[in-house]
């Protein structure tokens, strides 16, 4: 059995610890959370009546999963997450979906995905993959897709410079203020007491695009970006 990378151990411990509060604290306080989900789903180039088979990386508590199942009512989904506690919340949330959803605990940098899939999706998860494993992951995702399948990833990316990152934080705070979103006491307490790193290691956006192209994806693009959040898209070409 492969030795777990320290980032993976940290991620699992972090999300196991915060699973009970994830939906309460982070859906509101994470910048562009719902908008990232919406852009991932909007870019799926399929009619809504399609019987899609979808792979999800980093299912978490099942929020993107539920939106996918609602938007594509004939779809099925296979999802993975490193945290057993997060998946327990997802299973409860998605109980009505029955056999349409299969959820598994595991390190997505090590799993052999049971393709073929029509689409692979993710939101705010792949940055937790250990840096050396990220390029390899894109090759494995390419192999898991059927010809004509699509990869759509929303994630947190590393700003080009520290100064730009600080500007992003300022603009996000201003946006929250305009929207009337205030830091709740529960979230302030979480931030003050949670000194354990989450295992995340964000990467420059251009690296994702480069790795996707190197893996064989075509029509690779950044289809949406707001500050340090972005959605990238690529297609596995139809074979002749």
Predicted regions and their residues:
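A short His-aromatic
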Residues: 71, 127-129
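A short acidic, Gly/Pro-enriched loop at the edge of an enzyme's catalytic core
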Residues: 112-120
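Core SAM-dependent methyltransferase catalytic element
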Residues: 215-240
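C-terminal alpha-helical "lid/dimerization" subdomain adjacent to the S-adenosyl-L-methionine
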Residues: 154-213
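Residues lining the SAM
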Residues: 122-127, 154
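A short glycine-rich, Lys/Arg-flanked "PGG" loop and its adjoining helix->strand segment in the class I
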Residues: 135-147
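Conserved class I S-adenosyl-L-methionine
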Residues: 2-48, 63, 67
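Class I SAM-dependent methyltransferase SAM/SAH-binding core
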Residues: 53-57, 61-110
């Amino acid at each position: 059995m492969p030795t777990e990378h320290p980032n993976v151990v940290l991620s699992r411990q972090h999300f196991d610890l915060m699973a009970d509060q994830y939906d309460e604290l982070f859906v509101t306080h994470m910048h562009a959370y719902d908008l990232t989900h919406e852009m991932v789903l909007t870019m799926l180039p399929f009619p809504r009546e399609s019987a899609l088979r979808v792979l999800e990386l980093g299912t978490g508590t099942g929020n993107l999963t539920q939106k996918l199942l609602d938007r594509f009512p004939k779809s099925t989904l296979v999802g993975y997450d490193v945290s057993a506690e997060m998946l327990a919340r997802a299973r409860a949330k998605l109980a009505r979906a029955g056999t349409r959803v299969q959820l598994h605990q595991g390190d997505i940098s090590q799993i052999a995905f049971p393709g073929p899939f029509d689409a692979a999706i993710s939101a705010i998860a792949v940055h937790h993959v250990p840096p050396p494993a990220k390029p390899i992951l894109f090759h494995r995702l390419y192999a898991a897709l059927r010809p004509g399948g699509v990869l759509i990833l929303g994630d947190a990316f590393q700003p080009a410079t520290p100064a730009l990152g600080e500007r992003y934080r300022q603009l996000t705070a201003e946006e929250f203020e305009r929207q009337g979103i205030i830091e709740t006491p529960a979230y302030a307490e979480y931030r003050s007491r949670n000194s354990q790193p989450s295992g995340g290691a964000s990467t420059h956006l251009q690296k994702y695009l480069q790795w996707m192209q190197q893996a064989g994806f075509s029509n690779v693009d950044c289809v949406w970006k707001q500050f340090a959040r972005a959605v990238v898209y690529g297609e596995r070409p139809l074979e002749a």
